[in-house]
Amino acid sequence: MPMASVQGWRGKVLVGLLALLCLWPLMAAAQDKPLSAFYRETWTTRQGLPHNQVNAIAQSPDGYLWLGTWEGLVRYNGLEFHVFDRANTPELKDNGIRSVRAASDGAVVIGTSRGGVTVKRGDRWRTWMEKDGLAQEEVMDALLDRQGRLWVATESAGITRMDGEVPVQFNERN
């Protein structure tokens, strides 16, 4: 009797696993939806973007969407756009935004095409340029690592890591 109950238990598990394996493709196929099945909204200069080309998108922990365009940084709250550019944000040295990254602590890291890199923390903005140790002001991407160090990938001069106030350069020579 104990042997029969063990075999019965194993049989049920085997049948259950086989059923799951047979249903797996159906479950996966049920999740494939055409793009038209999803809600889609298009934003252009008509809705408030400063430029129709969006180069980067990030979402900060507080829910804002951050968009990088050739005419400035945009914060979107779901209803309206707020544009940050050289005219209203002197810390942004260039309107051409190539990269935007949102850090887990709420900081927003902004890489510009000719104005270095800027980090926004709350209402404070800080910009790094060549005079601050960047290898180049033409930034392709930038981010903060888990230790809070700023890493900046430049257009043609390698990578700069900011350890506090001390820049460390990584390029073809080192």
Residue positions per predicted region:
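Carboxylate-rich, polar loop motifs that coordinate divalent cations or form catalytic acidic clusters
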Residues: 1-174
